[in-house]
């Protein structure tokens, strides 16, 4: 029995006009985006189509990606496609919570708009940096971060694949970690174009505000298992608030999450929402995995044909 997991895109996957074709062609997609606009108090479709500056600002990026992803999820559900498990990268975890039945969509929209604003305030653009480290053993990376942390905060932030780990933190400390990694033989280090050092201790203030906002939301039972970023384990309802609070300031354990899904029998991964970042990671983790992504009319039709 083939088991299928839906994976939901995270921040950085956004692009101008994402989801436009599907919005024009399918009522459920239009209804979902319009529903988000009502919650937000601004025209989300117009922002996604016409305002690239805002679309790349964390407080707008997060609801834009969430709404686009959930709209596509609802369309697939309408077509009879349902996952056996779900997960999402960072922000994508909120789309996964909606898909799993644990979080109401309108609550999710309001929540990620707050999350985006808190993250922006806690780590204003330019306040830190993130660097992807390729083809370097995890223990070497962790050791370099530990040594460099005499200069400030620097830790692994995203364990994307065994050969791609992102470190993040304060500029001086990250730069020192990069020097140490180069001395240790790391050849490929790529500075990332992100608005802040997410998933590090620099987001403590955002984490505290988010904790407060999360207590005001009512969560439901999971209709489908969700593998969480922070521990790479199936999330339990009574721990949702704790794990989402920690998720902003702790590393995302993506490749361990994929391994857990594979242990549970998942062989097919469908990436939902803008971009193909997660499909790329899964391919690096296991080149035998079956992959598809759905973000526009062409990819939807290709997926439905298979």
Identify what each model region corresponds to:
Residues 191-194, 262, 295:
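Short glycine-rich catalytic loops that host catalytic nucleophiles or stabilize transition states
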Residues 12-13, 100-242, 246-248:
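Alpha/beta catalytic cores of group-transfer enzymes, especially the acyltransferase/condensing modules
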Residues 61-63, 197-198, 251:
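Glycine-rich phosphate/pyrophosphate-binding beta-alpha loops
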Residues 77, 182, 262-265:
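Non-catalytic positions within long, well-ordered alpha-helices that form the structural scaffold/packing
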Residues 300-305:
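Short, charged, surface-exposed secondary-structure boundary motifs
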Residues 2-140, 188, 268-297:
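FabD-like malonyl-/acyl-CoA
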Residues 249-266:
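A short, acidic, amphipathic alpha-helical segment used as a generic capping/interface helix at domain edges
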